[in-house]
């Protein structure tokens, strides 16, 4: 365990050094762009496009106030969406699938709408030209290139969004050598979100990215992915040893998250904290 503690301390020092130097350089090239987000107030953004992906999931494109603006969201963080339902304010957090570097003048959200879901149903019922209220950025994770040699990711359902955002950022940066192994679980094959985009990322970085898709109920006899849940054995088989320079990122349904956290401890990772911080070896979005 001493080796793990030394590695953890070293990783924290490297993280803060790289975060400092990364921010000194202005991060990416849009440091001159006007950022649309504000933490202290909600701003309205107009829905300009909707693409239905599954029977209950769609990608929504929202226009910023000016076509030269960027959303201003650090990679790995999220926004808060708020509306009034039944006379009461309700809110929920979402991670956009778009990056500031590639989406100037707009941003995109991936939302699965539930009949009983206040915000998700509200967004699902939106018509082109209607507006939502958003504030941010929020969250304790901000991706910085090359802090860890390996990112071990576990995602379920729409929990893929922060993972996809991070992988896109890595793929866009030729100097980023971070390796990614993703276990992505869903109920049915049709529930797999952003599959084409994820497969394209693997094609761009075949030596860095590896994805295993898992289904609870595969409907094809020739399904080539995994079946069932993210088990201890699967994590042990797929991910590097906890003694290596690896950070575990988790996002998905509560039951999946709880199971993965228990498995992580059994594999030698530190116990996940109630509120994850950027430097933690196990980070839960």
From Swiss-Prot:
Signal peptide extent: none
GO BP term, example: tRNA wobble base 5-methoxycarbonylmethyl-2-thiouridinylation
Domain FAD-binding FR-type as annotated: residue spans: 40-144
Any Gene Ontology CC annotation: endoplasmic reticulum
Pathway assigned to this chain's UniProt record: Protein modification; peptidyl-diphthamide biosynthesis
Gene3D superfamilies attached to this UniProt entry: Nucleotide-binding domain of ferredoxin-NADP reductase (FNR) module (3.40.50.80), Translation factors (2.40.30.10)
Keyword list, A-Z: FAD, Flavoprotein, Membrane, Mitochondrion, Mitochondrion outer membrane, NAD, Oxidoreductase, Transferase, Transmembrane, Transmembrane helix
Enzyme class: oxidoreductase
Cofactor section: FAD
Reactions mediated catalytically: 2 Fe(III)-[cytochrome b5] + NADH = 2 Fe(II)-[cytochrome b5] + NAD(+) + H(+); 2 Fe(3+)-[Dph3] + NADH = 2 Fe(2+)-[Dph3] + NAD(+) + H(+)
Subunit structure: Monomer. Component of the 2-(3-amino-3-carboxypropyl)histidine synthase complex composed of DPH1, DPH2, DPH3 and a NADH-dependent reductase, predominantly CBR1.
Family, per entry: Belongs to the flavoprotein pyridine nucleotide cytochrome reductase family.
The protein, known as: NADH-cytochrome b5 reductase 1
Taxonomic source organism: Candida glabrata (strain ATCC 2001 / BCRC 20586 / JCM 3761 / NBRC 0622 / NRRL Y-65 / CBS 138)
Record gene name: CBR1
């Amino acid at each position: 365990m001493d080796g793990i503690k030394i590695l953890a301390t070293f990783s924290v020092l490297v993280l803060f050094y790289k975060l400092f130097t990364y921010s000194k350089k202005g991060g990416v090239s849009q440091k001159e762009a006007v950022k649309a987000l504000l933490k202290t107030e909600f701003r309205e953004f107009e829905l300009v496009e909707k693409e239905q992906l599954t029977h209950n999931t769609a990608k929504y494109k929202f226009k910023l106030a000016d076509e030269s603006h960027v959303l201003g969201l650090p990679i790995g963080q999220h926004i808060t969406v708020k509306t009034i339902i039944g006379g009461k304010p309700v809110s929920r957090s979402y991670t956009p699938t778009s990056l500031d570097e590639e989406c100037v003048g707009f941003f995109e959200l991936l939302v699965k709408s539930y009949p009983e879901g206040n915000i998700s149903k509200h967004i699902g019922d939106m018509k082109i030209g209607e507006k939502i209220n958003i504030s941010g950025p929020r969250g304790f994770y901000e991706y910085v290139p090359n802090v860890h040699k390996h990112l071990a990711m576990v995602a379920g359902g729409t929990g893929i969004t922060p993972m996809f955002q991070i992988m896109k950022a890595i793929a866009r940066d030729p100097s980023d050598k971070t390796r990614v192994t993703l276990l992505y679980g869903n109920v049915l094959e049709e529930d797999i979100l952003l599959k084409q985009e994820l497969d394209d990322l693997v094609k761009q970085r075949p030596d860095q990215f590896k994805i295993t898709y898992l289904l609870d109920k595969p409907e094809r006899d020739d399904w080539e992915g995994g079946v069932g849940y993210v088990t201890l054995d699967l994590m042990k088989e797929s991910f590097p040893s906890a003694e290596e320079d690896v950070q575990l990122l988790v996002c998905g349904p509560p039951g999946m998250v709880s199971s993965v956290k228990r498995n992580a401890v059994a594999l030698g990772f530190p116990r996940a904290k109630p509120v994850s911080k950027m430097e933690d070896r196990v980070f839960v979005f």
